[in-house]
Amino acid sequence: MNYLADTIAAIATAPGRGGVGVIRLSGRNLLPLAGQLSGGRQPRPRHALYTDFVASDGQAIDSGLLLYFPAPHSFTGEDVLELQGHGGPVILRMLLARCLELGARLAEPGEFTKRAFLNDKMDLVEAESVADLIDAQSETAARSALKSLKGAFSAEIHRLVDTLIDLRMLTEATLDFPEEDDVEWLEKADALGRLAAVRRQLATVLATARQGAILREGMHVVLVGQPNVGKSSLMNALAGDEIAIVTDIAGTTRDTVREQIVLDGVPLHIIDTAGLRETTDTVERIGIERTWQAVERADVVLLLVDGRDGVTAADAAILARLPERLPRVFVHNKIDLTGETAGVSEEDGHVVVRLSARGGAGVDALRQVLLEAVGWQGESEGLFLARERHLDAIRRAEAELEAAGQAYGLAAELFAEHLRQAQACLSEITGEFSADDLLGVIFSRFCIGK
């Protein structure tokens, strides 16, 4: 049995109550099914038909709009039906059950978009952008996801692939004429110059993709320090709300407290943690263990110190335990008590921000430091969202092109092979060269109905 030949159905609107709910179906030859749903009425392509949706006994389940999009001019490339009824969960479940009764099966997560991909209605980057647009955590991320959905990222990759194909054709032509000297032929065609040009182009795309990945993923910022240095106050200041409990009692925060904010379109996942100290309190010790677990998953660590005490031996011990790979920022808090001036400086190779978490002085400067620490350049125009798998594929293509440069002059066969591998890496991004298990992972993360 051809699994993709099944008619699939799902509720396409978000769970809960609403004014309108949508059931989506996709498959082959859906007009007979549409007639059974509507009591014998036949919808015209791309025209809304107001009708009752009827059960097997002819009783109305609901009334609403029936829309029919015949293949191949539909979202999935197959016949598509949309039932727009009232948005109550019970009604929608009854309508979905009726569709399943008529021979459809329940769609898997992302199966509508997967069929669109398999039917060449969109490439893999555009398909992923559907999920990214739904999951966007800021306006900037949503706009960038829409650019990817409209093909901006794919166009960049296709330009790179086309350039590599031209260079491969040139190189492989030398292999077809063994009487010609390989190196001399490639020098005449400026193959090395063309390789340098495509490497520059790839570096530009990688830089843009990194920015897009920051927009999509955001970053995890963990606040660490001794008890009562102002971690919870700083979290509240960054969030602009009273998220964490603040008292003068050391050890008030005993577990991780999480909050998400958006800075310049970038989602920041801020994690306040238990104060780090030696303790016999069982609950507090569990909180301290969770602090170190959060640090391991962080993108940036803020090490808070009490500005009145400066960096103590206990602070130095915390610093020594932080993973080397992690960007860290020293935050000297409580300048309202020390009389210091708010601002950013570099001391002993560390970025230091002096601020008052309670008064707010210097907090804006810290926000800018956080964006710089994660590599955000603040320019969202022209950005497209990217995923870690995209960055990995581009980096591997970059390595293959570097190897091609090293192979130049040694053997045209080796030079051509590295170009081919680079092209294959880039083609993974758009799905022109992808393993079935990769496709399964990607589409399984979509919501039902997409």
UniProtKB/Swiss-Prot annotation:
It holds the Pfam family MMR_HSR1. Its EC number is 3.6.-.-. The keyword Cytoplasm applies. The keyword Chloroplast does not apply. Binds 1 potassium ion per subunit. Residues 218-375 form the TrmE-type G domain. Keywords: Cytoplasm, GTP-binding, Hydrolase, Magnesium, Metal-binding, Nucleotide-binding, Potassium, tRNA processing. One of its GO terms (cellular component) is cytosol. K(+) binds at N228, T247, I249, T252. Exhibits a very high intrinsic GTPase hydrolysis rate. Involved in the addition of a carboxymethylaminomethyl (cmnm) group at the wobble position (U34) of certain tRNAs, forming tRNA-cmnm(5)s(2)U34. Belongs to the TRAFAC class TrmE-Era-EngA-EngB-Septin-like GTPase superfamily. TrmE GTPase family. PANTHER family: TRNA MODIFICATION GTPASE GTPBP3, TRNA MODIFICATION GTPASE GTPBP3, MITOCHONDRIAL. This is tRNA modification GTPase MnmE. It comes from Laribacter hongkongensis (strain HLHK9). The lineage of its organism: Bacteria, Pseudomonadati, Pseudomonadota, Betaproteobacteria, Neisseriales.
